[in-house]
Amino acid sequence: MNPLIFKEDCPLDLIAVGRLCVDLNANETQRPMEATRTFTKYVGGSPANIAIGATRLGLQTGFIGKVSDDQMGRFITRYLQDNNINTDQICIDRTGAVTGLAFTEIKSPEDCSILMYRDNVADLNLDPTEVSEDYIKQSKALLISGTALAKSPSREAVFLALEYARKHDVVVFFDVDYRPYTWQSEAETAVYYNLAAEKSDVIIGTREEFDMMEKLLNYEESNDQVTAERWFSHHAKIVVIKHGGDGSIAYTRDGQSHRGGIFKTKVLKTFGAGDSYASAFIYGLMQGLEIPQAMRLGGASASIVISKHSCSDAMPTRAEISAFMEIAEEIV
């Protein structure tokens, strides 16, 4: 059963809010970053990747965010426009803030890392006054990402967007997206992540991310069922807990759980899997699919993206996912 009810006759299916950055992915693999000489530039940031993926699958998508007033900011905005994402609510920073950069290192499929430059970034300067209630109420769903909660004024802008979404019956997806380098402490992170999760209809995160959110509760051990049930006393209708190569489990308020598997593929790198999973999972739910079907789409999309060099450029179409699912071995 799909417990989500989406409004009808909205010009937008999904609005994402938060991080817009640039990924610089290593062209030379099987070597450390110190020995890497060339990189390829892509648009990045978890909410950006998810919005791009959802659009490529057929959703009408918009974005609320802030970019730097320079070549990188213009590159991001133009890329989103070229990929049919509404950019009416992307603001330009006038304070001299810069675009966040993510350099990737691909030593092996199992050994990948990211070097982030996140000082004085434009996306965290998004102000509450730049969040339009009218824009949000025109959408069926809102996607928020945890990184946007790391600092003010972006933090307050996200919470205002959440309030507008709740007011206008907009379904809220929360992609936890925990990046330690943007936070002062795990305690600070847990406080704001918990506040956001309480207002969300669907929460998607890894087991490790949920463990971080539960730091303040002093649980003796991780328990997926206990984690999910905690959020059902608030707004949550679906809680998805991801376990990497072991797949994922989706819990619903009526006590059901659904296990999602993975599809075998030739892995190039590990990053991008979560964003591609989320985009296809959200798409499936918004198309009225049952949760297990939406999870299969997410798993297939993730396997496609980790086999390719980029994240945003590699986001698949519905036809590409269908073709992949016909030939790939599924492990549940």
Swiss-Prot record:
It is an enzyme of class 2 (transferase). Belongs to the carbohydrate kinase PfkB family. InterPro entries: Carboh/pur_kinase_PfkB_CS (IPR002173), DKG_kinase_firmi (IPR022841), Myo_inos_IolC (IPR030830), Myo_inos_IolC-like_sf (IPR023314), PfkB_Carbo_kinase (IPR050306), PfkB_dom (IPR011611), Ribokinase-like (IPR029056). Catalyzes the phosphorylation of 5-dehydro-2-deoxy-D-gluconate (2-deoxy-5-keto-D-gluconate or DKG) to 6-phospho-5-dehydro-2-deoxy-D-gluconate (DKGP). GO terms for molecular function: 5-dehydro-2-deoxygluconokinase activity; ATP binding. Pathway: Polyol metabolism; myo-inositol degradation into acetyl-CoA; acetyl-CoA from myo-inositol: step 5/7. Keywords: ATP-binding, Kinase, Nucleotide-binding, Plasmid, Transferase. This is 5-dehydro-2-deoxygluconokinase 2. It catalyses: 5-dehydro-2-deoxy-D-gluconate + ATP = 6-phospho-5-dehydro-2-deoxy-D-gluconate + ADP + H(+). The keyword Transferase applies. Its EC number is 2.7.1.92. Pfam families: PfkB (PF00294). The keyword Transferase applies. GO terms for biological process: inositol catabolic process.
